[in-house]
Amino acid sequence: VTCDLLSFEAKGFAANHSICAAHCLVIGRKGGACQNGVCVCRN
């Protein structure tokens, strides 16, 4: 999942990071965040 496609911000909250984290949880990771436009999952 690329964060550029999901990037939008509302009232200072970057939704792309939470969408990335949710994506990582779905695939069995411990969450994640966007780094340079790419969703990076934690192990």
Curated annotation (Swiss-Prot):
Its biological purpose is as follows: Antibacterial protein. Strong activity against the Gram-positive bacteria M.luteus, B.megaterium and S.aureus. Reduced activity against Gram-positive bacterium B.subtilis and weak activity against Gram-negative bacterium X.japonicus. No detectable activity against the Gram-negative bacteria E.asbriae, E.coli, P.aeruginosa and S.marcescens.
Can you tell me which family this protein belongs to?
Answer: Belongs to the invertebrate defensin family. Type 1 subfamily.
Question: Got any disulfides in this one, which pairs?
Answer: C3-C34, C20-C39, C24-C41
Name of the protein this chain belongs to: Defensin-B
In Gene Ontology terms, what is a biological process of this protein? Answer: defense response to bacterium
Note the InterPro entries from the entry. Answer: Defensin_insect (IPR017982), Defensin_invertebrate/fungal (IPR001542), Scorpion_toxin-like (IPR003614), Scorpion_toxin-like_sf (IPR036574)
Q: Where is this gene product found?
A: Secreted
Q: Name one Pfam family in it.
A: Defensin_2
Could you tell me the keywords of this UniProt record? Antibiotic, Antimicrobial, Defensin, Disulfide bond, Immunity, Innate immunity, Secreted
Q: Which GO terms describe its cellular component?
A: extracellular space
The superkingdom listed in its UniProt entry is: Eukaryota
* Transmembrane residue ranges: none
